[in-house]
Swiss-Prot record:
This is DNA repair protein RecO. Keywords: DNA damage, DNA recombination, DNA repair. Belongs to the RecO family. The keyword Secreted does not apply. The lineage of its organism: Bacteria, Pseudomonadati, Pseudomonadota, Gammaproteobacteria, Pseudomonadales. GO terms for cellular component: bacterial nucleoid. Involved in DNA repair and RecF pathway recombination. InterPro entries: ARFGAP/RecO, DNA_rep/recomb_RecO_N, NA-bd_OB-fold, RecO, RecO_C. GO terms for biological process: DNA recombination; double-strand break repair. It comes from the Bacteria. The keyword Transit peptide does not apply. Signal peptide: none annotated. Pfam families: RecO_C (PF02565), RecO_N (PF11967).
Length: 227
């Protein structure tokens, strides 16, 4: 039988399983994979922590794999304070939204770079908004920031609302939750220094993600709020 090839991975979530094992959700270039790690109190179990770059060998053909081998491939991204809450938020988004065993190699790379940037103390908000947008795009939920639902160009002095199932729609009368065209055009260029861009990005991503996350609150968001 052909030996499965090791692949890079990060731990998204883990919990005790039976007496001495752990049930671990990994993020790999091949997607989110759930596997049983036996003898979790040994050397392998000490590696089952978030933000540690790993190499994992996964065995089995079913949805629930078995960990054949698990090794660290580098130094863990040392996150603390708000950066730690941000990393946990990314993990929870991936656990909630990423389908099992669907390959997303570019998203894996973006996740790796985001962890490194968080550990380096880069400003949190642009990193989080960029990751949220990349996740929406990879899952097929993204929409144009420079054109509205009628294929008209977004104009700086216009007002727009998000129709999650379609995209941005221009409106003539002010109402809560709208976005300025100038803000949307700044987001399209990732111009985080533009007036109002970061706040607009946070509102836009929250609206865009809400329909896919459902009504169950994000634990990481509650922890961040109570910090």
């Amino acid at each position: 039988m052909e030996q499965p090839a090791p692949q890079p991975a990060y731990v998204l979530h883990s919990r005790a399983y039976k007496e001495t094992s752990a049930l671990v959700d990994f993020l790999t270039p091949q997607g989110r994979v759930r596997a049983v790690l036996r003898r979790a109190r040994g050397k392998g179990g000490s590696l089952v922590r978030p933000f540690v770059p790993l190499e994992v060998e996964l065995r089995g053909r079913g949805e629930l794999k078995n960990v054949g081998r698990l090794d660290s491939t580098g130094i863990a991204a040392w996150l603390h304070g708000d950066a730690l809450f941000s990393g946990l938020y990314l993990n929870e988004l991936l656990m909630r939204l990423l389908p099992a065993e669907a390959p997303y190699p570019a998203l894996f790379e973006h996740y790796t770079l985001t962890l490194q940037a968080l550990a380096a103390g880069r400003p949190l908000e642009p990193l989080l908004r960029s990751f949220e947008w990349r996740l929406l795009d990879e899952l097929g939920y993204a929409f144009s920031l420079s054109q509205d639902v009628n294929d008209a160009a977004v104009v700086a002095d216009g007002l727009y609302r998000l129709r999650v199932d379609a995209g941005l729609e221009r409106v003539e009368l002010f109402q809560p939750g709208l976005f300025k065209g100038s803000e949307l055009l700044a987001l399209a260029e990732a111009d985080w220094d533009a007036p109002g861009a970061l706040l607009a990005a946070k509102r836009l991503m929250r609206q865009a993600l809400a329909v896919h996350l459902g009504t169950k609150p994000l634990v990481s968001r509650e922890l961040f709020r109570k910090r």
